[in-house]
Amino acid sequence: MNYRVPSLKATALAMAALTQALTTWDAAYEKALADLASLTQSEKVGVVSGITWEGGPCVGNTYAPESIAYPSLCLQDGPLGIRFANPVTAFPAGINAGATWDRELLRARGAAMGEEAKGLGVHVQLAPVAGALGKIPSAGRNWEGFTSDPYLSGIAMAETIHGMQGSGVQACAKHYILNEQEHSRETISSNVDDRTMHEVYLWPFYDAVKANVASVMCSYNKINGTWACENEGILDTLLKQELGFRGYVMSDWNAQHSTVASANTGLDMTMPGSDFSQPPGSIYWNENLAEAVANGSVPQARVDDMVTRILAAWYLLEQDQGYPAVAFDSRNGGKASVDVTADHADIARTVARDSIVLLKNSNNTLPLRNPSSIAVVGSDAIVNPDGPNACTDRGCNVGTLAQGWGSGTAEFPYLVAPLDAIQERSSGNGTKVVTSTTDDATAGADAAASADIAIVFISSDSGEGYITVEGHQGDRNNLDPWHGGNDLVKAVAAVNKKTIVVVHSTGPVVLETILAQPNVVAVVWAGIPGQESGNALADVLYGDVSPSGKLPYTIGKSEADYGTTWVANGADDDFPEGLFIDYRHFDKNEIEPRYEFGFGLSYTRFNFSNLAINIDATSGPTSGAVDVGGAADLYDSVGTISATVTNVGGVSGAEVAQLYIGFPSSAPETPPKQLRGFQKLPLAGGADGVAEFELTRRDISYWDVGQQKWVVPEGSFQVYVGASSRDIRLDGSFTV
């Protein structure tokens, strides 16, 4: 282990600059249609059907036809690395990637994940994630996605897809749609109005489709009473017609409930082709689909459309040109015959480092300045004594938390614990390190009592509902720290006047007890940082870089402040909050958060000046023809807004300039302000830079339910530019 600060190498930057293969959808469809003519009916239904659970080396495998040169597709999780394979890179989770607010890093992370997937022979990587979006702060899988804000989620989805598909792997946007909790996820109906669907939950999928995503995964839940994977309004009307999606829709694993209904409403591929039992059951397609065509229940044209979409996506990514063979077996330990990790540890470390959010820093306690002694307290500071991969699918919270749990995980090739990195630094500067690596409050206080500085590590975990951890069935039962974290901090802070708290968490944690301790002088949110956890944290704690992460969600003073929680006892969720989730809810109801959306401190200071608004837009609905991503004129530029950001401190740092827009009164009720632009500016001390935000018609439109179109309203739009959703430094307006 070393403590150099990595930089993205030229190769990584080159990967990040990629968009995707040069083939167009039209050219891909031409090739797919030529192949279609050569396939038998048996081969067609094989292309659209999984081989059944554990029927091949990957978590999903399709049948390979003999009539054309087309393989058995390998489909494999996941959103932070390749599941059931080793060695691979265990990247920071999506929620950390979102917290970087850095387009280049989002794309570089996606490119590196895609490169590893292709190297292992994975054709379809089951990522990225826009659902769960995060309307429920305790929801189990929020960490797989990027943020609770639809605009930021959409940008993160697009950048990640460009990175992944630029490396040659098919991306899969998931979970489509309204899969916002783990409790009862396979029976719950998410009942939502049309405007909320479009402006909140569908918004990031617009960006995914616009980025030419190859595939979309429909979710387990029902939507307005009908299963997502046989919901014509969701699969056909919205996705394929309104958004102009030209790829294919696959089911989540065992989320299909019918043969005919799923086929006729827009499902294109069933995964894994059966349920999880042995011998396999619930085989809805393959021969059963052929029979449904033969008896007239499913039109032949629908099956041909399924096959064409799947083949076209394969051609779009040019996977017909020397694609690697599958190099691992999920069911046999996952040991790969090739090492695909390259220099990706540098990217993982950079994302983890630049996602760290400094929440509190009284008296400039951080960065550390070679203290004579440090107490490191808490089980979250060390690697699980049984190893970082001891629990299947990371289904435990033992040792430092660097992944959530469930199918969206990967095997750690190694895990650098915070204590390891701190000890490495301390050995070079003469700092004595004392430890208490349990969560026992008395032992923690004993270790901290005589130290110059105490660093307490606490965590809060969550994951997928098929695993229950410490009584949490995927979703968290509350927003408290686990393992008595509040009591641990109280005990340490009672005896040490310089107590620093580091939080590893899958989502918001209520920090009121911790912040009430006068001796808690700094709080660091480190999220779900992946394999380079300790190194990234040390880079920030010791001042090698200034923290530049910003919260991808709001941290409230209580769980009740959010106005949403997961629905219990098998009931449906009627989404009564509508458009008003996370900061939109806090703003509407004038609730003071503890730390607002977009918040994050630095070791330097930034000023904002010179707001310039150059917008020229006309009111009214979209009128363009539907293209990939929706109505073509939806993405027309209406001008720019810019501001100057100056680093007025003495050290280098990076500021995220954020643009929020408030709609005129002529529009239906909307959130007081909505994120509509951001730019991360790295600036040396004394330097300045210009943040420029280009707005499209979509950015200043609302969804008109009556017209079924996006509409730009007349009137005065409010412009807010600042360092967070509530730290507004400049404001102005423009009129349409």
UniProtKB/Swiss-Prot annotation:
Its EC number is 3.2.1.21. It is an enzyme of class 3 (hydrolase). Gene3D superfamilies: Glycoside hydrolase family 3 C-terminal domain, Glycoside hydrolase, family 3, N-terminal domain, Immunoglobulins. One of its GO terms (molecular function) is beta-glucosidase activity. The active site is at D252. Residues 1-21 form the signal peptide. It is found in: Secreted. Pfam families: Fn3-like, Glyco_hydro_3, Glyco_hydro_3_C. It comes from the Eukaryota. Disulfide bonds: none annotated. It catalyses: Hydrolysis of terminal, non-reducing beta-D-glucosyl residues with release of beta-D-glucose. InterPro entries: Cellulose_deg_GH3, Fn3-like, Glyco_hydro_3_C, Glyco_hydro_3_C_sf, Glyco_hydro_3_N, Glyco_hydro_3_N_sf, Glycoside_hydrolase_SF, Ig-like_fold. Belongs to the glycosyl hydrolase 3 family. This is Probable beta-glucosidase L.
